[in-house]
C-alpha cells in the first residue's frame, strides 16, 4: 500500500516528481547530480545533511555540509558533524535562538564516541564547524531576519564569550531572512557586505553568503 503525500519530499525520495517514489533511483539521482556539477564546473559541492545516513553516498565528492534549522538541535546530527572531515555549517533553529546554534557548534567541535551504521565510532571533533544565520519565525508565523549589522555584532560577541575554534558565520540570504522572497537576496547580500566593510570584527567573522537559486538539473536513469 502506497502512502500518498501532499508535498514533495525531495529527489532522494522521488527523483521524478511525475512518477512514484523510488529510493534506489533517488540515491542514484543525488549522486549523479553532485558528480555532474563536479565534472562540468570543476567545483566540489555542498549539501544539507537532512539524513546523516546519506553521507555514505556523497562524502567522497562533497566539500561542505549544512545542518538545517530543524535538525540543528538533534543530537545525532551534532555527533555526525563532529566526525565530518569538511566544514559543517549549523543553522540557527527556526526560533532564532543563537545560543542553541552555538551549543551545536560546541557539540560538533568536541570528540565523541557513538554508534553509527551499527559500528562504534570515535570522532575527534570538527574544528571547522561554524554558524549559519537564516532568520527566524515567531509564534505568529512571521519571519524575523537576523542578517542586520546588530545581529552580526551580537553573534560576534557571543562567539567571543566561548572558547570555539575558527569563529565563522555564513549568512543565508533566503529562508526567513528574505521571507522566501528570492529577489530580496540581492539587497540582503549587499547589506551584509556593507556590514563587513564597516566592522573589522564582522569582516573576520562572516566568511560568505548562502544564496538560493532555482537552477534545475534534469536526471535520467540512463545518464551515467
Where are these regions (language model features)?
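Conserved small/polar residues in nucleotide/adenosyl-binding loops
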Residues: 2-6, 219-224
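Conserved, mostly hydrophobic/aromatic
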Residues: 171
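Alpha-helix termination/capping residues and helix-transition junctions
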Residues: 163, 202-203
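Short, structured loop/turn "capping" segments at alpha-beta junctions
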Residues: 165-168
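Redox- and metal-dependent alpha/beta enzyme cores, enriched for Fe-S-associated oxidoreductases
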Residues: 157-160
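Active-site-facing alpha/beta catalytic cores
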Residues: 5-154, 175-191, 195-199, 205-208, ...
Amino acid at each position: 500500500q502506497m502512502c500518498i503525500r501532499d508535498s514533495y519530499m525531495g529527489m532522494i525520495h522521488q527523483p521524478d516528481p511525475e512518477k512514484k517514489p523510488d529510493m534506489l533511483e533517488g540515491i542514484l539521482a543525488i549522486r549523479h547530480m553532485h558528480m555532474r556539477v563536479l565534472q562540468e564546473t570543476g567545483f566540489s559541492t555542498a549539501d544539507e545533511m537532512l539524513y546523516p545516513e546519506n553521507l555514505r553516498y556523497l562524502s567522497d565528492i562533497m566539500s561542505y555540509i549544512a545542518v538545517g534549522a530543524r535538525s540543528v538541535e538533534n543530537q545525532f546530527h551534532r555527533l555526525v558533524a563532529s566526525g565530518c572531515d569538511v566544514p559543517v555549517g549549523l543553522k540557527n533553529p527556526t526560533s532564532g535562538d543563537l545560543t542553541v546554534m552555538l551549543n551545536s557548534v560546541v557539540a560538533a567541535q568536541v570528540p565523541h564516541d557513538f554508534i553509527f551504521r551499527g559500528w562504534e565510532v570515535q570522532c575527534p571533533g570538527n574544528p571547522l564547524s561554524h554558524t549559519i544565520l537564516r532568520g527566524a519565525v515567531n509564534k505568529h508565523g512571521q519571519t524575523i531576519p537576523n542578517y542586520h549589522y546588530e545581529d552580526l555584532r551580537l553573534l560576534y560577541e557571543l562567539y567571543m564569550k566561548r572558547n570555539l575554534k575558527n569563529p565563522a558565520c555564513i549568512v543565508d540570504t533566503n529562508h526567513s531572512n528574505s521571507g522566501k522572497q528570492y529577489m530580496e537576496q540581492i539587497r540582503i547580500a549587499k547589506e551584509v557586505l556593507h556590514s563587513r566593510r564597516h566592522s573589522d570584527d564582522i569582516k573576520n567573522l562572516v566568511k560568505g553568503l548562502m544564496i538560493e537559486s532555482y537552477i534545475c538539473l534534469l536526471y535520467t536513469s540512463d545518464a551515467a
